[in-house]
């Protein structure tokens, strides 16, 4: 199906371009959300008549997204979740959790604007991509930890899944020669 794009759509085209897409993509996504029009003579003349207002509205949405992006870009947010000793989360941090975290900080972001390939399932520092507008893309950092203190240590670069971090054990004190002393048994090497 041929459609006229009413806004820039990544991996598809710019506003005003006529592109060929699959029928289902057009019927179920582009047309209902107002992102495209069917490419026929009537819609082409309608688009040309409304082009200036569409461009102005698109520019306004882009500037709003850019102001939010200037505040959000590169920010770090702490996410406290329960996790096992190895750093594996008992649950996960998904796109809706990211939306809730940003909403608690006063940012109104939609779930479809959060791009997570897979949910976050381990503690650590994770980069999350936010696409606020078709032309405005930023990254925020999620500091996933078991507690606020661990998040602070993690932000300083400390590894929290090592043996030392988990058990508070000094690995140098666990040398085998400290545990095995042949003279301690009372058996002399010359007699054996």
UniProtKB/Swiss-Prot annotation:
Keywords: Ribonucleoprotein, Ribosomal protein, RNA-binding, rRNA-binding. The keyword Membrane does not apply. One of its GO terms (molecular function) is rRNA binding. Residues 179-192 have a biased composition (Acidic residues). It comes from the Bacteria. Residues 172-192 are annotated as: Disordered. The keyword Ribosomal protein applies. One of its GO terms (biological process) is translation. GO terms for cellular component: ribonucleoprotein complex; ribosome. Binds to the 23S rRNA. Belongs to the bacterial ribosomal protein bL9 family. This is Large ribosomal subunit protein bL9. The lineage of its organism: Bacteria, Pseudomonadati, Pseudomonadota, Alphaproteobacteria, Hyphomicrobiales.
